[in-house]
Structures are given as C-alpha cells and as structure tokens.
C-alpha cells in the first residue's frame, strides 16, 4: 500500500474460504486472457512466463507488479529475510518486472530487502519507490526540494542501485507548491538518478500542475472493485488524457475481496491498522458482504478465486492499469498471477457493474487522519 496501510493478520487463511465455496481446486490453468493494452510476453532465465506487458506512460512493465510493503512491514511481524527475498525473486521468475516499495515502509526495511533481492537481476526489473514523509521527525508530509534529494540519495543506497526507475511523491504536501516538487524530481531526472516521476493519491489539479513541469509517468491510488474513487474524481480520466499510467494499491480491498473476512473477524490493534479503519468494523464488513458476493459468484461461475476475479476486473478497466498486489506467500503469489488467465468478457463486466451499481459501500477504507492525506474528492 501507501503510507499507513493496514496490516493483514495471519488468522483466517483465505483458502479456507475457497474450500467452503467449492473452489479450492480451481486456481490456475484457465483459458487464456486477452486484455487490451497488454503487449508481448515477458521472459526470464527460466524461460517463457506468459506475463504480458503494459505501458505506464513511456515505461514498459509487467501487467501485474509486486507490492513489497507487506513483506517487511505493516502486515504483522516482518517476514523472515530469506522468505522475503525468495518471494521477490519468485515473482521475477514468474515474469514480474515491476516492484513497488517506499522509504516509509518499515521505515527503510522494505527498500533494503528489495535492494538485496533484486541486485543480481537489477537490469531486468523496474523499481518504484516513494518520498514525501518526514520519516525522521513527526511523520507528516514533507516534500521540500532538499528533502526530496536527500531521500533520493538514501533510497539509492538502500536499493543498491544507481537509478530509481519511478520516484513517487507518496502524498501531496500542502505546504510545498507542486511545481517545486516536480522541479526537484526533474533535476534528479536530468542527473540520471531518477528515470520517471509519479504521484500517489493526488487529485486532478495537482496532477496537471506536476505534469506541466515534469511529465508524470504514473499515479498510484487505492482502486478496487469495492473502492471506486478514481472512477468518480476524474483521476482515471486525466490519466487517459495525458498518457499517464495508473497503479492501483489495495487491489483486493485490503483483503476484503479475498473472501476470508466475516463480521466476526477481529484485527490485532498492535499489528493491524484495520482495527481502526471504518470499513473493517464488524457492522461494515457485514453491510459490505453483498459487494463481496458479486465477486464470489463470478469466481464460482468462472471456476477461479475471488482474488483472481478482483485482479482480472482491474486489468479489464483500462489498458494503462497495472495492479501491484502484495504478498509474503509463494502460494498467494501464484494465485495472484493466475488472474492473468481469467477471461472476463464484456458481458461479465456488465453483469458485475449492474450488480454493484445499486449497492452502497459502507465505511471509509482508512481512518480520518489517513483519508485527510488523500486527494479523493
């Protein structure tokens, strides 16, 4: 995720849900997926992976990326280092070329792990990281040009690289004009330390302001079957207009769309931020079950899983969308990538949207403090 993402506890296993819905055996091996905007397949040293590519602006990446926050922070205790490295390298072996991290994840531990894991294959992958918080101070947004350049130098060292492929502003800093932010990143691009510029949870006005100074390659914001803000606030539209890619975080609704949550699910207040997020209260989980049911029914119909339907739905929305599901589990990694083989037809999408349209999403996905950092209006 971005900033203070919720931390999934390791209580219910999402595969228990698949068993109860008679879908446990139907994970991979489904009919080929054809999605507008996907290009040629990726190859690795292990051979053909069938992973297609998409364009974020002018940057070509695998159609599914890998969110690396949950491996080392925010989703319960950090994974064992060897496990984390193995998961990242397994993603690459399956064709993933786009890895997402941030200074604030840990802080620092995610970048360190990503840097070590990808160092032997650095020339085969694209790494995205983020600046924008006063990590050493009060944690508030901080995007002064001096801070941006300081973070860039530190991130380069942690990532064991001489360039950052995509450098996002993690959250808009209301105290620093967007033109100054874009100008600082432009200077880093001119120096060769950064290749592409991105924004996270920025609104249309700031996207345009940034793009007028330095081409914006990608916007990263929360987007999933249950979280539709980018469809309504103009962000997807401005991305299409300006040739900017879109990277959804929380592509399975912070775990809600996996299907394992119930109104009885409780989140550990010490390790899982969702305990304070309104959407994950018992009453709102119960109220939102009709939304989950749409995904569950389509998964049963297609002989696949709710996770794969959720990711396939995102891939079908726009040709410039590249979801970044995160996991520390090799089994879940393979399940995520199985979404590429799920064939959602136009009729499937219409059916899902018609079922969703009359429903109300209950509860914000984050608490008020986190929502205040996002330009979603």
Where would I find each of the regions flagged by the language model?
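C-terminal segment of N-terminal export signals and the immediately downstream linker at the start
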Residues: 33-65
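Structural preference for beta-strand elements that scaffold enzyme active sites
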Residues: 61-65, 98, 124-128, 163-166, ...
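Beta/alpha (TIM)-barrel catalytic core signal, keyed to glycine-rich beta->alpha loops juxtaposed to Asp/Glu
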Residues: 176-359, 371-376
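N-terminal export leaders
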Residues: 13-31
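Glycine-rich, proline-tolerant flexible connector loops at the mouths of alpha/beta enzymes
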Residues: 100-117, 171
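Short, acidic/polar
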Residues: 78-91, 144-158, 205-207
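N-terminal secretory signal peptides
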Residues: 1-16, 39
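N-terminal small/glycine-rich loop or linker at the start of catalytic domains
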Residues: 57-75, 128-139
